Amino acid sequence: MDKKTIIGVVLMSLIFIGYMLYSSKQQAEYQQYLEQVQAEEVATAQANENNEAEQAQAEASAEQDAESAQEREQSIYGDYLAAARQAEAQKFTMSNDYLTVDFSTLGGVMSKITLDEYTKFAPKDERTEKVVLYDPSTAKFDLSFYIKQGLNNLPINTSEYVFTSEGVRREGDAQRLVMQLEVAAGAFLQYEYVLYDEKNPSRDYMLDFNIKLVNLSPIMAQQSTLGIEWANRTYQNERSFKTENMYTTLSYHLPGEESVEDLGMSEDSKSKQVQSEVNWVAFRQQFFSQAFIAHNNFAYSDMGFTTESKDSGFIKSYSARLGLPYNAQTTEYNFSFYCGPNKYAVLSDVVGPDGEKIAMERLIPLGGWLVGWFNRWIVIPVFDFLSKYIGSFGIIILILTILVKLLIFPLTYKSYLSTAKLRVIKPEMDALNEKYPREEDAMKKQQAMMNLYKKAGINPLGGCLPMLIQLPLLWALFRFFPVSIELRAQRFLWADDLSSYDSVLNLPFTIPFYGDHVSLFCLLMGAAMIGFSMFTYNQQSAQPQMAGMKFMMVYMMPVMMLFWFNDYASGLCYYYLLSQLITMIQMTAIRRFVDDDKIHAMMERNANKQKNKKKSKFQLRYEELMRQQEEMMRQQEKANGKRR
């Protein structure tokens, strides 16, 4: 064997031995991998078996828990109430020309109330969303009472149970929905709702609600009252949160009273307990109300509200806890819900079960005795009459303003005559001021002025009388315009809604005490006030009391009104604008027909008559009083001189 062959055999042997060693190592690693995979598969299979066993055990345990929970619930509430807690709720709807009411058998309640004739505020032609008074996400109605359970009493809250119902039935001009909650065999609680369709708003905005206790007396626990918890959160429906909140509150009526009580307006939160009987409770908004009326009165009421944040989309959250008198003989309670607009003609026709007045129209805050009387018997009837023939409420406000100005024109004429007389005798008044320049002579000057007025036939208050007469009227309209639903959503010129402010410019910032918008009607009213004030000041500057009042009268008051009225109803600003323009026209016309020379001649004749006229007892007493005051001042001056 040669050398090359030996080397080749050795190399081949080494390669073979190396390959065998490498292969055995790979085989060992592969075997280890297989054993690991098999172990993992065994572990996974065992885990799956364990999980399946645990799941089966959990399902069995859940079934046992459900069965035991159901058994416990049945043992606590009985078969009927336990089933009512688990049942699936149904929904029903009743509607007429004015409103749509949705119902849910969960709690047997109204779940939503929609006013079909009214929409929420929206810019220009986007006003399509209807006003919703009652929404399931915000509202609650719960009747609570106790039933016997062995030696204990079990509280029942109807909001936790699903009632049964056969649906809505129509009976003539009415739709009827009956829902009942079976408490025990043959014993049940029944709710009956009746919605009318009589084409009469005072009836069709009403929803009768009757509660019947059928064979419940044997299982009812001893209790003097049943409780109703009524709650709701009202949506913002108008443009201005500030104004709508100002007129949104909780109101209530005591039996036999002509007035309505409320918890105050613009409060952040307020609550009140009334331990006496209450006829009805209302969640009142600026233009709409939900009133819960008890035909036989509530035994007591515990009520309150809280104001929501400006950007929440809501105005206030209401709650009322109401008591129903109960004894073993009680089988039925009768109520009515009013869900509709704060419209005087509608609310004044809402009556009690015997046809008696229940003061629902007093929900509208028209003002106190004199102001409220003027609104109820003059302003509202005129508006209602004119609206039958005129479609534009801007024109109606113009006509109302003209009628008012014609009504008080005689007083305006006398006021101008009084001002003209003062202008004629101004030289004599200036002479008296020069004659009595000292403060000590104030009584003498006043007496001399009064004698001058008397001789000229001037009433010192003649110029103020028309304004004093107009004050109740101005205040009445100030109360009427922001709560008049007749003006709501009524357009005129550039104003989208005469019941709210007209914004011709929305500011990117807020001016303190003014707001974040510019009301054009308010600006025009302010300009008219400045013009009217300057006109009046020039006419009345002869009066001593007018001296030094120019800045306050001509400039300060209009600017203050500009800040005050920027957020008020555009219809109100429009009325005040018209009122001042018409008054200036009247005064200008009177001035053209009144001759100062004729007035002076008339005053001379009056002075001659006064010389021959016997003084009245009042005049004699007044002159005597003036002499006594003058004598007292003279003695006081002497005493002061001696002390010095």
Kindly give the residue locations of the regions a language model identified.
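Transmembrane alpha-helical segments that form the functional core of multipass membrane systems
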Residues: 362-435, 444, 450, 454, ...
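Core hydrophobic alpha-helical membrane-spanning segments
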Residues: 8-21, 474-477, 523-528, 559-560
